[in-house]
Each structure stands twice: as structure tokens, then as C-alpha cells.
From Swiss-Prot:
GO terms for molecular function: rRNA binding; structural constituent of ribosome. It comes from the Bacteria. One of the primary rRNA binding proteins, it binds directly to 16S rRNA where it nucleates assembly of the body of the 30S subunit. With S5 and S12 plays an important role in translational accuracy. One of its GO terms (cellular component) is small ribosomal subunit. Keywords: Ribonucleoprotein, Ribosomal protein, RNA-binding, rRNA-binding. PROSITE patterns: RIBOSOMAL_S4, S4. It comes from Halothermothrix orenii (strain H 168 / OCM 544 / DSM 9562). This is Small ribosomal subunit protein uS4. The keyword rRNA-binding applies.
Amino acid sequence: MARYKGPVCRLCRREGEKLYLKGQRCYTDKCAIDRRSYPPGEHGRRRNKPTEYGMQLREKQKVKRIYGILEKQFKRYFDMAEKMPGVTGENFLSILERRLDNVVYRLGLATSRNEARQFVLHGHILVNGRKVNIPSYLVDEGDVISVKDSSRKSKRFKEVFEFNEDLTPPKWLSVNLEKAEGKVVAMPTREDIDYPVEEHLIVEFYSR
């Protein structure tokens, strides 16, 4: 399946909540879900009671859309989480949070995960001083993530830093926007997930 390239605001309306896929627009009164909170389409205003399977599927789709991941890779992360010690659902969320594009977003080096993915792909991001252009790269404790010197002076990055100047990163990350860099000070835990998610539904979906 190809990556979704349509209007991302439709995805938020489909899930019935903000997924913060549009960056700065999501924080303004132009946000589509604030104006039309029902799903898109001819029958969008109808609200049928979902089945158990439907609830599991919706939760899976929601988290996939938040992180911008396709099914094959999403399932691979789940398989990794199952093999790790501890609670599968919590392991799964921790893996998703450790993706480089997500970390760039969490640090405030981008205004959305999609923008962070583009920054990584175009070689603007360094990990421990070396360019990493793989959005799915999983960071480890102690890693330093920074914006390349030649890139941080660009108009777009200056706009990003200004927009995120008051941002407080999750406790597993530290950031210095003046230096355009941050550090992974710990591994993310369930407490660090700041969006509503019932990960047990995803576990149940893949355990059917």
C-alpha cells in the first residue's frame, strides 16, 4: 500500500480527534476538525455503534496515522514489541516514539511529524554528528540529535524554532533550540505518551 498523499485533515476527521498532522494549522481556528467534527463523506454525520473488531481497527489506524507509518512496518514494530520483555502494548508505543522523525518532532525541530520526516529524508538531521536520512531509525539513550549547521540558518528552520520556542519536550528528551539540538536522556515509557490511545485494542487486533 502506498503512503497516503491526500488531505491529512480528512484523517483527523475520520478518527474524530486531532492527530496534529498539519503542523501549525492544527493550532489555529482553521483546523478542519474544529469546524467539522464528523467524518468526511456523504454519510459522515451518521454515528453507528462500532463492533469490537471495528474499535480495534480504528485504534490501529489512528496510531498508524499519527506516526505516518504503513501497515507492513507497523506490524513489524508490533512483532518486535512482542519479543521484548515487559508489556507488549507499552513496548510497542516506546518503539514508535523512538523513531527519528518522531524525535525530531518531539524536540521541536519540526512542527509536525510529516515535516520532520522530510527534514530527515533531505539530510538536514544529524545523530551524534553524522547524517542519518532514515526516518525509521530508532534512537537510543545518549544519542544527540541536531540540525546540520548549514540547514539551521535557513528561513524555514528559523520559523520552526520561533514557533516552538515555548515547547516543553517529554521528560525522556532534553533540547536546546538555540543550538538546534537535543538529547535522548532516557527511553520513553507509557507515561510519556501524550495522546489518548488504548494500546490494548491494537494488541487484541494483532492477537486475533
